[in-house]
Every structure is written in structure tokens, then in C-alpha cells.
A protein has these predicted regions:
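C-terminal module of multi-pass small-molecule transporters
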Residues: 1-148
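Short, intrinsically disordered terminal tails adjacent to the first/last structured region
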Residues: 150-159
Length: 159
């Protein structure tokens, strides 16, 4: 690989955080094209840069006999983490919406109340991504050279 997984994944955390922060600027008058779509594209690119190297890193050094089990554990952890994360951010959005409704004495279906809840959830999401990026850089020590050495060890010469 040209770049190590630490840098690629950190770049993904940066992009995803930036996209999430763009979503915190939403208002009830926001439209899809200039406000939402660019942020969603940036978040998607960032997540792609996070999950591909993360998978390679998680399976790095796992013996051939254990690759299937390690991959299954990784996929299970990603599914559970995604479900818990969505539930957590949904709870944040719902709680923030309820707090806004009570504080401002507005209808719960008022667009400003809904957007307030979403903005709080996007802010928390950005914070979680920042924390993930910091933990990634602090804890993952696999370099590009390590990954290349693993690729060379896995190759077989054919005559």
C-alpha cells in the first residue's frame, strides 16, 4: 500500500467529522442540494476511508485458520456498533427535540423543534468521530511497511 492504515483512516475520520459538522448548520429552511447532499457525500467518503483500512487492520496478523472467525467477529461488532450508535443518536435527537418543545412552548411537529434535535445529534456524532480518530491514532501502530510485509508473507511463488 502507498499509505499506511493510520493515515488513511485518520483522513476518513476527518472527512466524516467535517461532513457531520456541515449538517449542524441546518435550519428549517435548508434545502437538500446546497446543505444536505454535499455533507452526505463527504460523510460517505469519510466512512469509506474508515471502514476499509479498519477491516484490513483488524484482520492483519490473523492466521489463515482463524480468518473466517475474525472476519465474523469484525462484522458482528460493526453491526452491533452501528445499531447502538444509531439508537444513541436517535435518543439524543428525540431528547433535544422534546427539550426544545418544552422550553419554547411549540408544537412537537414544528420544523424548528425537529431540526434542533437533529442538529444536536449531528453535533454528538461529530464528537464521537473526533474521539474515534484520536483513539485510532493513539492505539493503532500498524504502519504501511507492516502491511506490505504481511502481503509479501502471504504470497506464494509460482513456477
Amino acid at each position: 500500500p502507498r499509505f499506511g492504515p493510520r493515515y488513511v483512516t485518520f483522513g476518513g475520520f476527518f472527512l466524516a467529522t467535517f461532513g457531520m459538522l456541515l449538517l449542524t448548520r441546518l435550519t428549517p429552511d435548508s434545502t437538500y442540494w446546497p446543505e444536505v447532499l454535499p455533507a452526505m457525500i463527504i460523510i460517505s467518503l469519510g466512512m469509506g476511508l474508515i471502514f476499509v483500512p479498519l477491516s484490513a487492520t483488524a484482520l492483519f496478523g490473523v492466521g489463515d485458520d482463524d480468518t473466517g472467525v475474525a472476519s465474523a467477529v469484525l462484522n458482528t461488532a460493526q453491526q452491533i456498533g452501528g445499531s447502538v450508535g444509531i439508537a444513541f443518536l436517535n435518543t439524543i435527537a428525540t431528547s433535544a427535540t422534546a427539550a426544545y418543545v418544552i422550553a419554547n412552548n411549540v408544537n412537537p411537529f414544528d420544523a424548528s423543534a425537529q431540526v434542533e434535535g437533529y442538529v444536536d445529534a449531528f453535533t454528538w456524532g461529530a464528537g464521537i468521530l473526533v474521539l474515534g480518530g484520536i483513539l485510532w491514532v493513539a492505539l493503532v501502530k500498524i504502519s504501511r511497511k507492516d502491511m506490505s510485509a504481511g502481503d509479501k508473507a502471504a504470497t506464494v511463488e509460482v513456477q
